[in-house]
């Protein structure tokens, strides 16, 4: 699927409008829908990194030679942590974009991993992509909920060092937003306030008939398919395959990433779209990738650390 988004960008001493969302100089969103018609720029989520809103407005990106110098001279873990600390100290608008690797350190399995796929097929007879599709939910809700409750509805998981470090960074006034692909709500449990959940949350559930709200415990404790007292089936507020992302959540994520002077991407291989394409909206020169394995964007990053996201962030955030 290919997503196109229209952004409007303008700057003044008092406010900035990105994606039709007005910001003050302190990064507070002051108005949704104030688009500046004088500076339209059409950008696609899967465009090359060089196509960014700020580049279109004449702001210069860091050169390849400078990027390589930062990466190549920081060879060991301690040096890279020092470099990450310096980046954080010089930044005012940090955004974190996270994936499944953040949650796996809390004991939550990654259903897209080789082990996760094997478990799904072995236990339920279908791959995760089919089990978690809208079509499967409608046609075989009994199997869907058996899989969902067994492997995704993890209400007993606790925040880890990465969640704690990000909440601390937000409390310090450095971090403006967490953009996550995870549905477990652990960022909020750790204390983060401004969280954009791209794929929804297990903690929000609604009756498909009357729209009544139910928490995760109700769904978990309900035997078989969860039903509302009105008789309607309850659907978790998680984005299934074949479903679109919430446009308001996507807009907020894009706006914050576009305004960021530092983007930390952690616990993701950057291969799941459209979430991975959000990195293309960043136009600064402090792109940090923290993942145990390499990603397609490593050559674009100013700093790459192949290690545990919790270990790295807890060492860097003081």
Specify the residue positions occupied by each region the protein language model found:
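Intrinsically disordered, low-complexity proline-rich regions
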Residues: 24-29
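Conserved catalytic core of sirtuin-type NAD+-dependent deacylases
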Residues: 42-44, 54, 58-318
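Ser/Thr-rich, low-complexity intrinsically disordered segments
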Residues: 30, 34-38, 60-62
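N-terminal amphipathic/hydrophobic targeting modules at extreme N-termini
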Residues: 3-6, 11-13, 19-23, 37-38, ...
């Amino acid at each position: 699927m290919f997503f196109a988004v229209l952004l409007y960008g303008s700057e003044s001493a008092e406010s900035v409008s990105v994606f039709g969302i007005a910001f003050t100089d302190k990064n507070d969103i002051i108005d949704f829908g104030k688009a500046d018609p004088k500076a339209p720029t059409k950008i696609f989520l899967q465009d090359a990194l060089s196509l960014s809103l700020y580049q279109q407005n004449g702001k210069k990106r860091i050169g390849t030679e400078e990027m390589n110098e930062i990466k190549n001279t920081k060879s060991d873990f301690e040096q890279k942590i020092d470099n990450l600390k310096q980046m954080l100290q010089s930044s005012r608008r940090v955004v974190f974009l996270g994936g499944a690797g953040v949650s796996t350190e809390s004991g939550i399995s990654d259903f897209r991993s080789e082990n996760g796929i094997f478990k799904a097929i072995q236990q339920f007879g279908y791959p995760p992509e089919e089990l978690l599709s809208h079509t499967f939910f409608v046609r075989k809700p009994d199997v869907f909920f058996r899989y969902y409750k067994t492997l995704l509805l993890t209400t007993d998981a606790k925040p880890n060092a990465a969640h704690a470090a990000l909440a601390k960074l937000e409390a310090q006034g450095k971090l403006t937003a967490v953009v996550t692909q995870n549905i477990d709500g652990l960022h909020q449990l750790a204390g983060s306030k401004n969280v954009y959940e791209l794929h929804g949350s297990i903690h929000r559930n609604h009756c498909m008939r009357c729209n009544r709200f139910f928490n995760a415990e109700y769904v978990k404790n309900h035997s078989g398919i969860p039903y509302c007292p009105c008789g309607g089936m309850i659907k978790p507020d998680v984005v299934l395959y074949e479903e679109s992302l919430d446009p308001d959540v996507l807009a907020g994520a894009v706006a914050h990433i576009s305004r960021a002077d530092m983007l930390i991407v952690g616990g993701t291989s950057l291969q799941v779209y459209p979430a991975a394409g959000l990195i293309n909206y960043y136009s600064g020169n402090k792109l940090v990738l923290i993942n145990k394995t390499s990603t397609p964007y490593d050559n674009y990053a100013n700093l790459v650390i192949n290690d545990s996201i919790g270990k790295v962030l807890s060492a860097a955030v003081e």
